From Swiss-Prot:
CDD domains per record: Ntn_Asparaginase_2_like
Native source organism of the sequence: Pyrococcus horikoshii (strain ATCC 700860 / DSM 12428 / JCM 9974 / NBRC 100139 / OT-3)
Name recorded for this polypeptide: Plant-type L-asparaginase
Modification comment: Autocleaved. Generates the alpha and beta subunits. The N-terminal residue of the beta subunit is thought to be responsible for the nucleophile hydrolase activity.
Record site feature (Cleavage), residues: S174, T175
Length: 305
């Protein structure tokens, strides 16, 4: 039983007219991933699905990543193989089109797991990734609007981030991710531009193995939402532990989000999972989380928010 699931991020989609575009985006990604999965590689499926999401400016990853407090882009990404526990990640990278592909190169071409900032950019250039500007006009306008609110005192920037997000849900934007099982191996991957108005140098859960991204021989998980929550709970690894204890992917997803809600409240997290039986799971405590999945026996993806 093979399966793949993708997400386009947890949070609140303020403009209802964006929802069909978001659903179409995750469906497109899962179809591309499914085609790769049918060729036999969960690793290729996860990378290619996430690249589709990174290239779609409606999502907060790659092209269309949100801006830091000083108006720049700093992106995070990670990918992990469940069979070997190999992993690669980049944090605070800029000037590349597909951070997930750079993360894969970290996994395959180095002895390291995580490269950050200028080091990640230099590595990307060594690997042949060309200079690319992922900033879009829409993100610039959103940044200007939020920065104006900040300057007027409407947003108290030094408040706890969770409180800020409750008042201004537009600050929290969508991470993207994918998890796949090819019949032999589970692979998980995640990519994000982070949180709007984040401090320069801030790193979320996405590139932290075990927090936002994790895979082993029993399950894989990709998290989305307020990264600091996933880091404190080691949420992706915790979710796979639930599977090891006997839950399927859906029950483990529910348990992971219940844990996040218990400690940090609602409107904080979402998760997607696949287990080694080919079951998919997804859960959230936010208003929305776009997702799409396909598995054996399905001709069209199941998708929603």
């Amino acid at each position: 039983m093979v399966a793949i699931i993708v997400h386009g991020g947890a949070g609140t989609i303020k403009k209802e007219e964006r929802i069909p575009k978001v659903i179409e985006g995750v469906k497109e990604a899962v179809i591309v991933g499914w085609k790769e999965l049918r060729k036999g590689s969960a690793l290729d499926a996860v990378e290619e699905a996430i690249k589709v999401l990174e290239d779609n400016p409606i999502f907060n990853a790659g092209t269309g990543s949100v801006l830091t407090i000083d108006g720049k882009v700093e992106m995070d990404a990670a990918i992990m193989r469940g069979k070997t526990l190999e992993a690669g990640a980049v944090a605070g990278i800029w000037g590349v089109k597909n951070p997930i592909s750079v993360a894969r190169k970290v996994m395959e071409k180095t002895d390291h797991v995580l490269l950050v900032g200028e080091g990640a950019v230099k590595f990307a250039r060594l690997m042949g990734f060309p200079e690319y500007n992922p900033i879009t006009e829409e993100r610039i306008e959103q940044w200007k609007e939020l920065k104006e609110k900040l300057m007027k005192g409407e947003i108290k920037y030094w408040k706890k981030l969770g409180e800020l997000i409750k008042e201004y849900p537009e600050v929290l934007r969508s991470t993207v991710g994918a998890v796949a099982f090819d019949g032999e191996e589970i692979v998980a991957g995640t990519s994000t531009g982070g949180v709007f108005l984040k401090m320069f140098g801030r790193v979320g859960d996405t590139p932290i193995i075990g927090a936002g991204t994790y895979a082993n021989e029993v399950a894989g998980a990709s998290c989305t939402g307020l990264g600091e929550v996933a880091i404190r709970l080691a949420l992706a690894k915790t979710a796979t532990d639930f599977v090891r204890l006997g839950m399927d992917a859906q029950a483990a997803s529910n348990a992971a989000i219940s844990l996040a809600t218990k400690y940090f409240g609602k409107d904080t997290m979402g998760i997607i999972m696949v287990d080694a039986a080919g079951n998919v799971g997804f859960a959230k405590n936010t208003k929305h989380m776009s997702y799409a999945y396909m598995k054996d026996g399905m001709e069209e993806p199941e998708a929603g928010v």
